[in-house]
Structures are given as structure tokens and as C-alpha cells.
């Protein structure tokens, strides 16, 4: 039994592995087929169609269908996919829009209701869609992309928000607009508290042939009878108010009921209309709500309709939301939702109402003669709608952009009462967030309505109406163009908005025409109107807090841009009172941080009217008019150009300017003004390029001013001081005139930089002018006292000195500024600052090239001072600030602490620089040491390598010498052997034998004599060759020995000497042989003897040659 189970397990395992292998092969073939189809640009094969079961017709054994092959995981994924007939895509149903979802109506119309019911039960997920799409529409966070067509749409959520009964406010709007009557309430509306999903069933019937039916299921009457309503539930019935034109109410035909399901609530809304146009609700319906406490909310009902249309009109009418909706109208106790024939729509984008610019032009009776550009940010209140009902004779919209009021509207007394009681404010810059709405509820008090009128041009007909004068008298104007609107600014602005404060934002308007000036009723308006320019005031939370002190009762600022004073305005006696009481103060050069606001509050008291007239052209009629002389006499032009607005100055500018004689307008001619404009244009353009950091440097430099010493002051010092004062005033007037001609869109930060630049310029000019007399340092208060004490001595000499100072060459200015900056840098440690931040760009009657040269000289001077500071190691300890008259000890200590802190900051910077320099030097030294060590190591390695090579060469040479010595020894042995053999043969030759053989040899001598001679010659040649070989070897040895003579190799010399001896022996042997050869001629015995010797020598020679070849190889 066990063997069978084991065998079966092995068979199953084998089959499993075989199946896995076949699947792997199948997957490879499928991949290759898909790639080949893509490469050939053919249609990719279908997974189902490519199966052979469709062709082979599955057998009875294979009862499974091809759908059963799919695994459970992929079945769950496929179950949520829907095919879009419009785009041919198979995508997730939970992320499809309605266009793709109902595309089945174009192909299959039989199962439309079943398919729609299935989709409705599936529901839709609200988590689809990217965050980037939602960021584009911050007010509609539910927008998402369709998974099929990537179009924005609003999905239905499972957790539908339904308004609760206890917090449901009353819904109200206008009744009859033309008749001014409100319709009576019919029924109340209540909402069913559904747990999960609420579907709205919207059914709209018409008396005409065209009819659009909206339902969720086919049974229409059973939907309201399935369940009994709960306790406290009121079934609403919605009727219609009659035609607006006839004023007759229409009777309601059908009612609205709620289907009380345990899980899903369906709302059935049936609406009848007498017109041909059909009204269709959008997906996100909302209403504007107003409760008894005058608080405004927007409740999102989110009752999304399930749409049912005839099959032939499914794709056309399902997504057409361009139908106009009528407003909802309610009353006190009983509310009734009504659709009237006015062209209004409601939306659910909280808190901003989304405008609809594509309103169809079907109803011609609405929005006639009006140009509608936008309807967003519109809040309709009950009080505003009452006024709107009185003024809505021709059905004009409340907020109109770029609308010119016609004379008919202005002459109507009803419109005057409307505009008198209407409070206008511009909240276009307020961010529309929920937090901002919570803060804005503090500002929105009773009797404050929100209407935005942009670009309204007040025509003469409106001004001539006496009823409108009271409106302009009570209207208080404020310009909030440059006021930013964060939440903190809104909190601070709540202090300014009191009861009866109605600000209006008039853009590009307010041109005072002669008709407006001639009206006596308007004179009182202009007299009570206080004008101020808040264009240069930054709108941070701190400045708003300070500005609340300045803005007191009856102070209403208006910004008039490019207002030209015409001759009619000047000749009008009523307008002279306004101009006489108006004080013109130039605040262009006043810095606007919080400290400047603190000091400026001393000047601004009650009934001070600050007017900034930009680009005012003083014509000849204005100068010659005697009525305007009072204006020029009483007008005070105060230049605060030279007054620093920091808290470090002890005396306020008010104390300094009390005794200064101020120059009026009639003292300056138009020619001088134009000349000053052309003269200082270059300097102002250069000053605009300064950075905002110059303000801090100005605060440092303005504390010390070089003035003449009292002991060494010459007689004409008073005139010089007076000339300096006049010069400063003329310069400030010129700069102010140029700044008024500057563009209006310059930000407050740039103006602050210009103000600090001008202040630094004047302080530098005073120091440069007075530096030629002495080099003592005085504080700012003493300098002003000297100027004030020498006032009133303006004469021709003073004016001449001013002109001389204005015309002096640039080199003089450069030298004075160099000396001044030298003293300041020595006392204040100005070397810590960069040359770019310190060098002032001043140009007085000079060109741009001279200014650049001056700036370059200043940079060179500062660099020189920095080098001197580093070389001398000057200590900054013990430097104290000068005492200011009337300053308390605490303030002086504070200034001392601030000054010491700045010095410590500079010292810390210098210390950090030295630390960084030492660190760099240390790193460089370490790098150099490392490099030297590497070079030393490389040299050592190279020396060791060379030494090793020399040792190897010496060993090789010693081996060669040893081989030569061995060769010589062998040769000597050979020679000795030869000699021994020769001696042996000599001893063995018997005399008798020689005698017997003599006769035989004599007989043979005749014939072989020639052959024997040849043999002997050959033997001699062999000996000669051997001798030459031995000689060459000896020469080589001698050369080698001579080359290595410095080694003092004694064994080599001994071997050479032995070789010489052997050579000598060989020579002797050769001589012996020659003698033997000569003995051949003495008979047969000599010949036989020679033959034997020759044969033996030949054998010896052959043996020696073989051994030599072996040794050489």
C-alpha cells in the first residue's frame, strides 16, 4: 500500500513538473507571438480566441468553459470592469464618468434599465482621481478624472451628506421681482436622515410635447408607498409660483415624496412648468442659506439624480446641463422650493459660488441691456434683496463689471434710496477659505452688505441729482488696493470696520469733471471728505495695528491717481475751502517700518487731511488765480527726506522742524522744478538700483555727522550752514517731484529703499560739505540745532554758495567722501561691510562715467582700510557711543549694547574668517607633506630597483667569465693529451719495421707523391684555422679583461698568462711539425712517419672540434 502511494506521488510530481515546463514553453511562445504582432503592426491575438478549444469543440470529458480557466484573483478584477462603447476601453466602473458609463445606449437598448440598476447598486468610489486635479479646483474637492476618457467629473459618494432637521435654516429668495410682492408659502421641506446613500429622483413634466423623465426604477407610484414615514417626518410637496409676467400663481400638479429605504434613500422630485424649456438639476445642488443671526452658510445637499431618458436621446440629454434654473423661495414658517422664470442658478462650491458663463439666451426677458462678465463671490441677503426688488424694474444684476450707469437709473429716486443704504466693500483680495469665512463673520455686522462695483464712471447726470448728494455725503471711501488679505490682516482690519463704515473700492474712476465742481451741493461733500494716501504703507499685522491709531474718527482716505486740477476747479469758490484746509505733506521719502509709524503718529492728529496728488500740473491759471493764493500761502510742503525714522534718535522730527522756515510753492518757479527734474534724474535712477540693505547702513552712518568746530569756525560758517539747509531742501523737492512721476506700481519695499538712499545722500552731503572745516564728530541732534540756530539768514551769498556747491567738480566730492568714510570706518568698524553695500552712488551735475569712477575709488579706499585694519590689528574694545542730549541712561545703554553687539558680530566674523584661513592652510600643509612622502617613497623604490638590476648584471658577468675559464682548461687538457699521444707514437715505432717498409714505400712514392703533398697542405690549413680561432678567443678574453681591469681580477690575469704560455708551446709544436714535414724528403721512412702523424692529428682535430661545438651550443 505504501509503495503504491509513493509511486502515485512520484507520478503526480513528474506530471506537475511536466506541466510547468509546458506552461513555460507556452508563455515563451505567447511572448514571441505578441512581440511579432507588435513588430509587424498587426493586431495582438486575443487570449480567448487563440485557444484551440473553440476549433476542436470541447469533448464531453472537458466540461469546463473557458471562463472557468481564469483564477479567482483575476475574476475579482474582471468583475468590476465595464466596457465603454464610445472609446472601446475596458476600465473600472467605479471611476467612469456618466458619458462613458451610459455609452451602452448607443448600441444595446434592451437591457438599459437593468444595466443602470446594476451600476446604481455598485455605487461609485470617491477615492479615485489624482490630487493634481483637485488642486486645480480647490472649491470642488470631489472632482476626479474618468478612468476611460480622463475628463473631470464629480463621483457620487457612499457617505452622502444630508442636512439635519435641527440645524436646517430657512431657504429664502425673492418672490415676484417685477411686482415687488413675495409669494405666500405653501409647504415645508424636511429631509430624511438616510444612513448610507441618498439618490435624488428628479422628474420634470411639461405641458408641451417634450418631456424629460428622471427616475431610478420603472415603478413610479410604488416608490413612495414602500415604507411608512418615521415619526416627525413631513412629506414635502413642491409647487410653482406662477408666471412672473402675469403675476398669477400656478396650482401644483404633483407632489414630492421620499422613498424610505433602510439603506438607500431615493428622493422623487416632480416639477411642472408652463414653458417649453426644461429645467435640469446639476449634480451638485446647493442653496444660499441665511438664518436669523445674519450668518451665511452653504449646505451641500448632494442629492445626485439617477437619470433616465428615452433611448434615442440618452447620449444627448443626459449630459446637457445648460438649462437655466429658477431660484428657491422660502418664507418664515413654511418653505417652498420654487422654479420661476428668472434666469438664476445655484451651485455647491463652498464658499465661492461658481459662475456659469454659458447661460443660453432662450429667455429674452432676463438680462436685457446688461453686459454680464462674472457672477462669482455673490452673497444675497434678505435686506439686499429687498432693495434689489425695489430697483429690479428691468431686472438688472447686482454685481456688474464695467457697467456705465445710465441716466435713467440715476434719476430714479428709488435707486437713490437703494444706493444710500447700501454699504459697499471690496473683498476681492480676501482668500476664500473656511478660516477666512470664520474671521470675516466678525467683520460682517448688521447693516453691512457685500456688493462689488468695479470700474463705475460717475456721469454728470448722477452728480446733478440732489438725491445723490446725500448718498455721497454718507459714503465713506477707502482704498484697499495695496492691502494684503491674510487672516492676520483680516483680524486687524476688524478694528477699523466699525458701525456705519461703508468702504467702496473705485478703480480707474473718480475723474472730477467741471459739472461736479460747479455743484454747490458737492462742495460740502468735498469739505467733509478727508483724503489720505496709504499707497506706501505696508499692510502687515504690525503696521495695521499702528495704523489703527492713525485712522481716527472722520478720517476717510481716498487715493486719487492722475487727477488733474482743471481751471474750473480752481475758479470754483466752493472748492477753495477744500484746498485751503488741505495740507500737502510729501511722504514719499518716509520709511514705513513699524518704528516709522510710531514716530509718524506724533504728527498725525485729529482733522489732519493728508492728500497725495500725483502728477499735478500747476498751470498758469492756477498761479494767477487770486482765489488760490490762500492755498499757496497756507500750504506747507514738509520734506521728511532728511529725518531718519529709527528709534535711536532722541529728539523727534517735530521738535527739529518747529523753527524751520518752510518753503512754499510760490517760491519755486516752474522752470526751477523742471530743471531740478532733469538735473537729478540720473541720481534718482541710480538710487533705485540700491539694495534694501542700504537702510541698515544709513542707520549706522547717520548717527555721526562731521560738522564745524565751535572754536575754529570761520565767519562764513553760518552762511554755509544756511546754504546746506537750502541745498537739502531743494534736493528733497527735486527727489519728491521725481518720485511722484515714478510708476505707481512700485512696491513699498522699493520705495523704502529709495527713502533710505535719499536719507543717506543728505547725511553724506552735509558731512562732505562741512568736512573741510574740521573733523570733529557730533550727534544728529546737535547738527540739527546748528542748522536751526542759523536759520533766517538766507541772502545772495548763501544762494551763490549753494550754486557753487552744486557745480563743484566730482573730485572734490570724492575726496570729501573718502575722508568721511575713513573716519566712520575707523570708529564704527565699517570694514566688516562689503564695498558694494557701503559705497553710495551720488551724482550731482555729473555723468554716469564720473559716478562709476567715484564708486570705484570708494571701493579701493575701503579695500585699503581693510588691509590697514588687518595689519594694525586695531582693537575695538572700549569704543562707546556718544551721548545725546535729553536721552535717558537706559536708552543710551541700549544703544551701547546694540553697538557692542554689532562690533562683536564683526569680530566673530573676522574670527571665523581666520579660522577658515588657518584650516585651509593646515589642509594645504598636510597635502604638501603627503605629497613629499609619496615622492620619497617613489625615489626609494627606484633606487632599490636600480641596485637590484646592477647586482643581477654583475652575477651574469661572473658567470660568463667562469664559462671562459672552463673552456681554457678544457683546451689545455686537449693539448696535453695530444702531446702525450705524439710521444707514445714515437716510442712505439720500431726501426726494423721501418727498414722493411722502406722498399715498399719507395715503390709507391712515384705515384702517390702528389696526393701526399695535397694531404699535407690540407693538414697545414687546418692547423692555421685552429691557430686563428685560438687567437681570436684570446683577443676576446684580453679585451674583456682590459674592460674589467678596475675590478682587479687576479685569477683572470693568471689564466691569460697561462694561455700565452700555451700559445707559445703551440708555436713550438708547429715549428716541430714543419721540421717533420721537411724530413719527408729523406726517404720512405720519413714519409711513413709523416703519414702516421698526420692521421693522428686529424683524428684529434675532429674530436676537439666536436667538443667545441657542444660547449658553444
From Swiss-Prot:
Span of domain GTD-binding: 888-986
Keyword Cytoplasm assigned: no
Keywords for this protein: Coiled coil, Membrane, Transmembrane, Transmembrane helix
Location(s) in or outside the cell: Endomembrane system
Tissue: Expressed in leaf epidermal cells, roots and root hairs.
Region (Disordered): 209-229
Main subcellular location of this protein, as a coarse class: membrane
Molecular function via GO: myosin binding; myosin XI tail binding
GO terms for cellular component: membrane; transport vesicle
UniProt keyword annotation of Transmembrane present: yes
Transmembrane segments: 12-34
The organism's place on the tree of life at top rank: Eukaryota
Phenotype of the disrupted gene, per the record: No visible phenotype. Myob1 and myob2 double mutant has no visible phenotype, but a delayed flowering. Myob1, myob2 and myob3 triple mutant has a significant height reduction and a delayed flowering. Myob1, myob2, myob3 and myob4 quadruple mutant has a significant height reduction, a reduced rosette diameter and a delayed flowering.
Bilayer topology term: Single-pass membrane protein
InterPro entries per the UniProt record, alphabetical: GTD-bd, MYOB
Free-text function comment from the UniProt entry: Membrane-anchored myosin receptors that define a distinct, plant-specific transport vesicle compartment.
Quaternary organization: Interacts with myosin XI-K, XI-I and XI-1.
UniProt domain comment: The GTD-binding domain is sufficient for myosin binding. The transmembrane region (1-61) is sufficient for the membrane targeting.
Protein name: Myosin-binding protein 1
Species this protein is from: Arabidopsis thaliana
Organismal lineage: Eukaryota, Viridiplantae, Streptophyta, Embryophyta, Tracheophyta
Gene for this chain: MYOB1
Amino acid at each position: 500500500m505504501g509503495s503504491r502511494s509513493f509511486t502515485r506521488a512520484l507520478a503526480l510530481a513528474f506530471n506537475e513538473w511536466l506541466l510547468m515546463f509546458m506552461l513555460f514553453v507556452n508563455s515563451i511562445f505567447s511572448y514571441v507571438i505578441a512581440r511579432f504582432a507588435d513588430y509587424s503592426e498587426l493586431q495582438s491575438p486575443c487570449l480567448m480566441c487563440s485557444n484551440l478549444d473553440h476549433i476542436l469543440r470541447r469533448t464531453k470529458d472537458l466540461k469546463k468553459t473557458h471562463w472557468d480557466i481564469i483564477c479567482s484573483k483575476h475574476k475579482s478584477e474582471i468583475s468590476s470592469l465595464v466596457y465603454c462603447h464610445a472609446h472601446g476601453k475596458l476600465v473600472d466602473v467605479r471611476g467612469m464618468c456618466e458619458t462613458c458609463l451610459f455609452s451602452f445606449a448607443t448600441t444595446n437598448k434592451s437591457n438599459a434599465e437593468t444595466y443602470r440598476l446594476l451600476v446604481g447598486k455598485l455605487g461609485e468610489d470617491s477615492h479615485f482621481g489624482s490630487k493634481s486635479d483637485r488642486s486645480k479646483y480647490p472649491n470642488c474637492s470631489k472632482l476626479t478624472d474618468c478612468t476611460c476618457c480622463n475628463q473631470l467629473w464629480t463621483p457620487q459618494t457612499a457617505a452622502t451628506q444630508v442636512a439635519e432637521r435641527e440645524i436646517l435654516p430657512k431657504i429664502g429668495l425673492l418672490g415676484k421681482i417685477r411686482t415687488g410682492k413675495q409669494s405666500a408659502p405653501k409647504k415645508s421641506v424636511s429631509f430624511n436622515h438616510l444612513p448610507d446613500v441618498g439618490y435624488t429622483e428628479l422628474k420634470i413634466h411639461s405641458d408641451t410635447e417634450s418631456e424629460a423623465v428622471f427616475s431610478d426604477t420603472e415603478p413610479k407610484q410604488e416608490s413612495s408607498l414602500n415604507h411608512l414615514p418615521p415619526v416627525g417626518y413631513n412629506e414635502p410637496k413642491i409647487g410653482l409660483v406662477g408666471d412672473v409676467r402675469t403675476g398669477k400663481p400656478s396650482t401644483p400638479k404633483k407632489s414630492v415624496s421620499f422613498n424610505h429605504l433602510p439603506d438607500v434613500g431615493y428622493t422623487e422630485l416632480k416639477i411642472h412648468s408652463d414653458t417649453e424649456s426644461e429645467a435640469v438639476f446639476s449634480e451638485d445642488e446647493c442653496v444660499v442659506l441665511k438664518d436669523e443671526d445674519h450668518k451665511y452658510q452653504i449646505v451641500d445637499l448632494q442629492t445626485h439624480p439617477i437619470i433616465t431618458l428615452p433611448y434615442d436621446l440618452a447620449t444627448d440629454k443626459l449630459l446637457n446641463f445648460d438649462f437655466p434654473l429658477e431660484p428657491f423661495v422660502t418664507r418664515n414658517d413654511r418653505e417652498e422650493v420654487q422654479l420661476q422664470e428668472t434666469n438664476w442658478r445655484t451651485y455647491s462650491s463652498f464658499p465661492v459660488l461658481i459662475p456659469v458663463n454659458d447661460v443660453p439666451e432662450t429667455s429674452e426677458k432676463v438680462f436685457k441691456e446688461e453686459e454680464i462678465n462674472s457672477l462669482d463671490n455673490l452673497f444675497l441677503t434678505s435686506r439686499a434683496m429687498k432693495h434689489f426688488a425695489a430697483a429690479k424694474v428691468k431686472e438688472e444684476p447686482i454685481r456688474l463689471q464695467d457697467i456705465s450707469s445710465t441716466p435713467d437709473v440715476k434719476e430714479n429716486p428709488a435707486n437713490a434710496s437703494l444706493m444710500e443704504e447700501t454699504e459697499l466693500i471690496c473683498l476681492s483680495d480676501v482668500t476664500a477659505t473656511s478660516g477666512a469665512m470664520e474671521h470675516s463673520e466678525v467683520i460682517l455686522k448688521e447693516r453691512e452688505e457685500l456688493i462689488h462695483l468695479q470700474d463705475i464712471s460717475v456721469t454728470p447726470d448722477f452728480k446733478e441729482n440732489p438725491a445723490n448728494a446725500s448718498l455721497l455725503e454718507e459714503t465713506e471711501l477707502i482704498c484697499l488696493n495695496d492691502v494684503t488679505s491674510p487672516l492676520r490682516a483680516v483680524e486687524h482690519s476688524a478694528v477699523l470696520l466699525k458701525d456705519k463704515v461703508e468702504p467702496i473700492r473705485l478703480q480707474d474712476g473718480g475723474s472730477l469733471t467741471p459739472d461736479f465742481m460747479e455743484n454747490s451741493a458737492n462742495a460740502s461733500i468735498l469739505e467733509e471728505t478727508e483724503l489720505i494716501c496709504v499707497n506706501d504703507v505696508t499692510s502687515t499685522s504690525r503696521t495695521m495695528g499702528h495704523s489703527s491709531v492713525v485712522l481716527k474718527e472722520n478720517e476717510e482716505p481716498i487715493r486719487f491717481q492722475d487727477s488733474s486740477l482743471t481751471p474750473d476747479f480752481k475758479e470754483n469758490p466752493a472748492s477753495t475751502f477744500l484746498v485751503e484746509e488741505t495740507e500737502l505733506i510729501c511722504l514719499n521719502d518716509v520709511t514705513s517700518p513699524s518704528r516709522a509709524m510710531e514716530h509718524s503718529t506724533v504728527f498725525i492728529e485729529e482733522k489732519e487731511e493728508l492728500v497725495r496728488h500725483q502728477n499735478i500740473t500747476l498751470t498758469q491759471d492756477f498761479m494767477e488765480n487770486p482765489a488760490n493764493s490762500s492755498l499757496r500761502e497756507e500750504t506747507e510742503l514738509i520734506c521728511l527726506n532728511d529725518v531718519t525714522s529709527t528709534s535711536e534718535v532722541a529728539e523727534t522730527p517735530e521738535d527739529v522742524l518747529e523753527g524751520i522756515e518752510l518753503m512754499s510753492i510760490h517760491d519755486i518757479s516752474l522752470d526751477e522744478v523742471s530743471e531740478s527734474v532733469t538735473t537729478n534724474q540720473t541720481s534718482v535712477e541710480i538710487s533705485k538700483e540700491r539694495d534694501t540693505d542700504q537702510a541698515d547702513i544709513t542707520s549706522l552712518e547717520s548717527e555721526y555727522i562731521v560738522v564745524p568746530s565751535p572754536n575754529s569756525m570761520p565767519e562764513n560758517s553760518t552762511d554755509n550752514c544756511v546754504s546746506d539747509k537750502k541745498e537739502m531742501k531743494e534736493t528733497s523737492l527735486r527727489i519728491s517731484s521725481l518720485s511722484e512721476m515714478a510708476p505707481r506700481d512700485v512696491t513699498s519695499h522699493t520705495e523704502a529703499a529709495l527713502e533710505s538712499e535719499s536719507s543717506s545722500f543728505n547725511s553724506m552731503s552735509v558731512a562732505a560739505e562741512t568736512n573741510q572745516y574740521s573733523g570733529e564728530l557730533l550727534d544728529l541732534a546737535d547738527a540739527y540745532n546748528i542748522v536751526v540756530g542759523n536759520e533766517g539768514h538766507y541772502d545772495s551769498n548763501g544762494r551763490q554758495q549753494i550754486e557753487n556747491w552744486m557745480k563743484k567738480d566730482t573730485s572734490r566730492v570724492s575726496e570729501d567722501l573718502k575722508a568721511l568714510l575713513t573716519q566712520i570706518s575707523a570708529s564704527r568698524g565699517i570694514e566688516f561691510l562689503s564695498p558694494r553695500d557701503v559705497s553710495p552712488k551720488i551724482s550731482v551735475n555729473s555723468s554716469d562715467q564720473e559716478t562709476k569712477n567715484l564708486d570705484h575709488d570708494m571701493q579701493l579706499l575701503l579695500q585699503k582700510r581693510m588691509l590697514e585694519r588687518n595689519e594694525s590689528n586695531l582693537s575695538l574694545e572700549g569704543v562707546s557711543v556718544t551721548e545725546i542730549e535729553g536721552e535717558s541712561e537706559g536708552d543710551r545703554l541700549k544703544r551701547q549694547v546694540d553697538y557692542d553687539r554689532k562690533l562683536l558680530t564683526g569680530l566673530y566674523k573676522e574670527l571665523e574668517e581666520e579660522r577658515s584661513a588657518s584650516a585651509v592652510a593646515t589642509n594645504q600643509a598636510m597635502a604638501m607633506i603627503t605629497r613629499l612622502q609619496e615622492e620619497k617613497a617613489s625615489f626609494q623604490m627606484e633606487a632599490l630597483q636600480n641596485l637590484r638590476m646592477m647586482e643581477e648584471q654583475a652575477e651574469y658577468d661572473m658567470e660568463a667569465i667562469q664559462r671562459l675559464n672552463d673552456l681554457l682548461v678544457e683546451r689545455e687538457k686537449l693539448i696535453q693529451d695530444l702531446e702525450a699521444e705524439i710521444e707514445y707514437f714515437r716510442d712505439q715505432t720500431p726501426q726494423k719495421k721501418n727498414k722493411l717498409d722502406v722498399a715498399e714505400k719507395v715503390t709507391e712514392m712515384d705515384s702517390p707523391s702528389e696526393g701526399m703533398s695535397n694531404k699535407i697542405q690540407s693538414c697545414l690549413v687546418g692547423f692555421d684555422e685552429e691557430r686563428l680561432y685560438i687567437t681570436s678567443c684570446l683577443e676576446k678574453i684580453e679585451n674583456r679583461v682590459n674592460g674589467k681591469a678596475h675590478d682587479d681580477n687576479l685569477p683572470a690575469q693568471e689564466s691569460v698568462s697561462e694561455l700565452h704560455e700555451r700559445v707559445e708551446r703551440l708555436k713550438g709544436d708547429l715549428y716541430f711539425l714543419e721540421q717533420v714535414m721537411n724530413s719527408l724528403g729523406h726517404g720512405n721512412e720519413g714519409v711513413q712517419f709523416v703519414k702516421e702523424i698526420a692521421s693522428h692529428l686529424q683524428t684529434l682535430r675532429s674530436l676537439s672540434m666536436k667538443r667545441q661545438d657542444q660547449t658553444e651550443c
